[in-house]
Amino acid sequence: MALQDFTPSEPLTLGVELELQLLSTHDFDLAPQAEDLLRETAKHSGAWDIKPEITRSMIEIGSSIQRRHGPLREELRDMRNQLTRAARKLNIAIAGGGTHAYQHWSEQQIFPAERFRYISELYGYLAKQFTVFGQHVHVGCPDGDQALWLLHALSRYVPHFIALSASSPYVQGQDTGFDSARLNSVFAFPLSGRAPFVRSWEEFGGFFDKMTATGVVQSMKDFYWDIRPKPEFGTIELRVCDTPLSVDKAAALACYLQCICRQLREEKPFEPSEDDYLVYTFNRFQACRFGLDGEIVDPKTKQRSRLRDDILRTLTRLDEHALDLEALDATQLLRDSLFEGNDARWLRTQRAAMLPLPAVVEAAARRWGE
């Protein structure tokens, strides 16, 4: 199949998707009750969306198209409140976090939908191991060429979003040593990582045609890239964030991306190049492993800096854009988190207080509902 045309959309509009954990209130392990929750929320109010994910212990919610931080945050709060009320009726809880702390992949059940069955048959046990939970942020672009320019310009900021959102230190009952262990599950897929360095939608169409001709991919959904174009929506989609423990953090991350995109579009501080990816994998690993304490290398200057410091400098450069976009509350929340620590640190702090892991997950569910 040919690559579809890129649908023009209003620049810098936002859409947020959150993958969420469904928890048993008995032991706070994952609960395979997605179908029940989908039925319970079928008549929800609001323009947002709820749909199943690859296994039956998770769901995905998606915002409507938003332009500013305040309305986005309020919509996410409304989504949270309606979901929490529906979950209570089913004796389940909902939580953020990039991984469940002690679930075992072999116990997960593939959601009965054609695409999920296809993924399970193709990837085997990796499909069940993909019971991990991420935040995806869409940013509107006027055409495919500008979408690809922005996609590559954003590559150096990918570690920012990994470290700020990181909330997955525990896997199958063990502290992995990573702030974001979730992304290790994504790395296992053969079409993950970075998009190819092409600059025009026509050239990207040629790449897509070659890939479909091999039979390796059937649609854009088969690419698990960190940032990918979404032509039917007219967006690029950032996919590296763990689902935060709160909707306020999710809204702040989305608006941080919006501010960066505005600065890149208006100021064009550099021109993206293939060499931007020389240190991409190293920087990505540092953010996953060490979070805000990681070190990154600037692809232009080759200088190393602490990731926390680089984010702080970026936030300072974005002040004017955040003011114009009415996102100062969002950027302040992220500034505070640079000193308070990310959600991975919060989860480890709960564990350090001698809480058993089920109690840590219960605390995360309470935090989600606040």
UniProtKB/Swiss-Prot annotation:
Highest rank taxon of the organism: Bacteria
A GO BP entry: modified amino acid biosynthetic process
Pfam families reported for this sequence: GCS2
Key words of the record: ATP-binding, Ligase, Nucleotide-binding
SS bond partners: none
EC number assigned by the record: 6.3.2.2
Catalytic function, reaction form: L-cysteine + L-glutamate + ATP = gamma-L-glutamyl-L-cysteine + ADP + phosphate + H(+)
Molecular functions (GO terms): ATP binding; glutamate-cysteine ligase activity
Top EC class, one word: ligase
InterPro entries, per database record: GCL_type2/YbdK_subfam (IPR050141), GCS2 (IPR006336), Gln_synth/guanido_kin_cat_dom (IPR014746), YbdK (IPR011793)
Record function comment: ATP-dependent carboxylate-amine ligase which exhibits weak glutamate--cysteine ligase activity.
Similarity comment text for this entry: Belongs to the glutamate--cysteine ligase type 2 family. YbdK subfamily.
Name under which the protein is recorded: Putative glutamate--cysteine ligase 2
